[in-house]
UniProtKB/Swiss-Prot annotation:
Organism: Erythrobacter litoralis (strain HTCC2594)
Disulfide bond entries: none
Gene encoding the protein: eno
Organism ancestry: Bacteria, Pseudomonadati, Pseudomonadota, Alphaproteobacteria, Sphingomonadales
Cofactor details (free text): Binds a second Mg(2+) ion via substrate during catalysis.
InterPro entries given in the database record: Enolase, Enolase-like_C_sf, Enolase-like_N, Enolase_C, Enolase_CS, Enolase_N
Keywords tagged on the record: Cytoplasm, Glycolysis, Lyase, Magnesium, Metal-binding, Secreted
Protein's name according to its UniProt entry: Enolase
PANTHER family: ENOLASE
Amino acid sequence: MTAIIDLHAREILDSRGNPTVEVDVLLEDGSFGRAAVPSGASTGAHEAIELRDGDQGRYLGKGVTRAVDAVNTTIADTLLGLDAEDQRDIDTVMLDLDGTPNKAKLGANAILGTSLAVAKAAAAARGMPLWAYVGGVSAHMLPVPMMNIVNGGEHADNPIDIQEFMVMPVGADSLAEAVRWGAEIFHTLKKGLSEKGLSTSVGDEGGFAPDIASTRDALDFIMQSIEKAGFKPGEEVALALDCASTEFFADGRYDLAGEEVSLSPEEMAKYLADLCNDYPIRSIEDGMAEDDLEGWKALTDLIGNKVQLVGDDLFVTNSERLAMGIDKGLANSLLVKVNQIGTLSETLEAVDMAHRAGYTCVMSHRSGETEDATIADLAVATNCGQIKTGSLARSDRLAKYNQLIRIEEELGNSAHYAGAACFGRLAR
C-alpha cells in the first residue's frame, strides 16, 4: 500500500549557506522519499513565492521555519493517508490548501519539497528510479549539458554584463563523454586564466569570474580554451549565453555598463544578433527583460529561426505565462525550474505544453543548490534534451552530472544522447 503515513520537514542549508526546506515522506509499505528545495539568487517577478521568515536575528531573515511548520502541520495533516501514487491529486490538494495564485500562504518551497518527496517515495514503492517512474518507457534521452564556465552580471564582480557564458558539447557521442569534454575545457580555461594573472576562484555555480573587460573578450577567451582543449567551436562545442537582461533593464532601455552603452530593445536585439553572427552561439536565455514583450518579439522575429531563445524570467515555468508567449510568438524555448512553479505536476504540464508548441526545453538548477539531484532525473523523464546545472566544480553541481552518468549506465543500449538534435527544428 502506498498511503502516506509520515511527512516531516526540516531546515537545512543550501550551497550558498542559506536555509532551505528538506522534506521526508514515508509510505505504509516502508518506502521513503526525500527532497531538498533549491533557491535562486536572481528571481523573476512572476515566480511562485518562496516563504522566508524575515527574522533578521536568525539567518539574516532568510530562515525557512515558517515553510517547515507549514509542511509539518497544515500539509501533513491533510496528506496523511492519501495515496502517494496519485501525484496530481496530491499536488492539487496542496494548491487548494494554499489558495493563492503564487503559493504565498504555504510557500512554494514547502509545497515543492513535499511534491518531490512524494514522487520519490512512490517511485521507491514501485522499485523504480525517479526518472523511469515519472517518464515511463519513453524516458531514454540524455540531455546536452549547458556548462556555465564564465560568470558576469549579478553572479560576478567584473565589468561583464552578461550573467553566464556556457559551453554545450553537442558533438559528443554520450553524456559521459560530454561531461569529459566539459571538464577538459574547464581545466584548460582555468590554466589560461592563471597564465594571464586572472582570478580562478569560482562563483555560486562553479564558473570563473575573471576581471575580463567585455563580453567579446570573454567569448574570445572561451573560444581559445575550446580549441586548446582539442575541440572545434561550433561543430563539436556550441556556446550559450544567459543574459539575465531584466537585471540591467530600466526605463525602457538596456544599460550595458561594461560596454558603456544604453540600448533600445531593437538595438539590444541587434547587439545579440551580431554576437551570434560572430560566434557559434546556439542559445540565448533571457535576452530581453521579463516584461519587455515588445523586445522579446523583436528578438524572436530577428533570430528566432536560427537561435534557441530561452524564456526563464519571461515564463517562470508557468503554463499561463508560457501560453501567452506561444500565442504572441515570444521566444522558442522554456527554461524549466521546478521551484519557480512549485509542484511536480505543474512542471510536467509546462514541459508538455512547450513540447506540443514546438518549443525546446532546458531543465535547470538554481544558484542555491543542494546535493539533491532530482533535476537530473527529471531532465531524462521529460526528454528535455538539455540541462543547465552549472560548471565542473562544486559538489552541488557535480551531483547532477554524476547522476546523469548513472542514469545513462542504467539505460544501457537504450540510452540516447541528444547531441545537436537538442535544438529541435533549429538543429543544423
